[in-house]
């Protein structure tokens, strides 16, 4: 995509004139509207800022556009690492939509921030706790109707690599769960930790050793490794993973480090004991480089993966049995949209938000089945941030 370098000042916001996307520093429009489009929700990004970490917040409008929330970015009370984490899920929303959980990779902590009625964030009381290891990179949360919610954190730092569990109360209190820590060997480089839909299975990826952990979760919230876990990946560099929203027994995992043009995605059947078996003739080629992050449409029909080194977003159709068919890839601008990482769909599934960490922006796409169409200007992220993790509410 050819980019023009001319710059104009429009309505107080700096706009880069481009043949395709533009980056806007998003001048403040009146709350509730942006070009006539009403606010329908928010988007949040873990800035992973070195020293005092923050979370950037944006109003999400009906047309997919974003405008900064007043007071953004919001302090987490912990410290970021100031560099890429190579992980998915560094920011999560609680099942009731009232809290955000953010990793503070520089201070080995997890922060809990309460989402106010207008979308702004405030640190919850007692909202910064030890992650139970070194360099937390990913967090997962699942709802439990008869007790406190359950949280697991993946710690990816040498000397303290593990999965550690917590309980999470309705008041936003995160408390360590005794006997929950599952130690990982140094060099595992955890990439993601995630629950299936009912919280009975937890999976984790190891980028450093190209393996996948799979566990059953007992009523007390403790982990029990599946027979054969950890499972050897079907390529090098497992980072992003997602359970199919419509089929809890299907897990999809990216294989990021196979080399130029050799990226793949794997599909696994998850057994009753959380054991993993390959689906079809996987892994499934995406003909791009470094597919790292994964998102699945809410109806379970399509899988999207960001190719960080390309840069592009690939789309697969998912068959009923979990086999994948490559639909195609949507290229991103190598100057403004380099380094795509985490991606998340809007609640209604019609807009896809992609972190382009190398371009320091959020890229927005309209979604029609498996087709992606760029929407307007890119949204700039705070200066000094090293963005990891995105949440759309």
How would you name each of these model-derived features?
Residues 1-28:
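Secretory targeting and sorting signals
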Residues 18-41, 48-49, 222, 369:
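C-terminal region of N-terminal signal peptides and the immediate post-cleavage residues
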Residues 35-38, 76-93, 130-148, 182-201, ...:
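Beta-rich, blade/repeat-based domains predominating
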Residues 48-50, 60, 105-106, 115, ...:
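Short loop/turn segments immediately following the C-termini of beta-strands
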Residues 58-66, 112-121, 165-174, 214-223, ...:
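Short loop/turn segments immediately following beta-strands, especially the blade-tip
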Residues 70-82, 124-130, 177-184, 224-232, ...:
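A short beta-strand motif characteristic of beta-propeller blades
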Residues 357-393:
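Blade-level signature of beta-propeller repeat domains, shared across WD40, Kelch, NHL, RCC1
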């Amino acid at each position: 995509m050819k980019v023009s370098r001319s710059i104009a000042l429009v309505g107080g916001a700096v706009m880069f004139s481009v043949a395709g996307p533009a980056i806007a520093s998003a001048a403040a429009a009146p709350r509730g509207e942006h070009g006539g489009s009403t606010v329908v929700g928010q988007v949040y990004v873990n800035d992973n800022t070195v020293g005092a970490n923050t979370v950037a917040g944006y109003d999400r409008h009906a047309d997919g556009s974003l405008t900064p929330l007043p007071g953004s970015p919001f302090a987490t009370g912990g410290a970021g690492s100031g560099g890429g984490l190579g992980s998915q899920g560094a920011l999560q929303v609680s099942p009731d939509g009232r809290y955000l959980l953010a990793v503070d990779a520089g201070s080995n902590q997890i922060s809990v921030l309460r989402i106010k009625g207008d979308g702004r964030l405030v640190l919850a009381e007692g909202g910064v706790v030890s992650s139970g290891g070194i360099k937390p990179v990913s967090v997962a949360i699942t709802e439990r109707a008869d007790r406190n919610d359950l949280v697991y954190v993946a710690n990816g730092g040498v000397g303290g690599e593990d999965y550690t569990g917590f309980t999470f109360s309705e008041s936003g209190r995160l408390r360590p769960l005794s006997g929950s820590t599952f130690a990982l060997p140094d060099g595992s480089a955890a990439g993601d930790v995630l629950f299936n839909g009912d919280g009975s299975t937890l999976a984790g990826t190891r980028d450093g050793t190209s393996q996948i952990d799979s566990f059953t979760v007992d009523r007390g919230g403790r982990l029990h490794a599946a027979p054969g876990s950890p499972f050897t990946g079907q390529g090098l560099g497992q980072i992003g993973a997602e359970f199919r929203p419509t089929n809890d027994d299907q897990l999809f995992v990216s294989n990021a480090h196979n080399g130029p043009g050799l990226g793949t995605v794997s599909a696994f059947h998850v057994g009753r004991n959380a054991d993993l078996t390959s689906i079809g003739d996987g892994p499934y080629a995406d003909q791009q480089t470094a597919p790292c992050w994964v998102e699945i449409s809410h109806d379970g029909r399509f899988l999207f993966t960001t190719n960080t080194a390309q840069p592009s977003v690939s789309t697969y159709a998912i068959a009923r049995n979990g086999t994948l068919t490559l639909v195609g890839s949507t290229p991103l601008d190598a100057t403004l949209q380099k380094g795509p990482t985490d991606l998340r769909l809007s609640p209604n599934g019609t807009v896809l938000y992609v972190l382009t960490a190398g371009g320091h922006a959020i890229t927005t796409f309209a979604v029609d089945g498996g087709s992606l169409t760029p929407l307007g200007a890119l949204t700039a992220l705070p200066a000094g941030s090293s963005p990891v993790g995105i949440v759309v509410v």
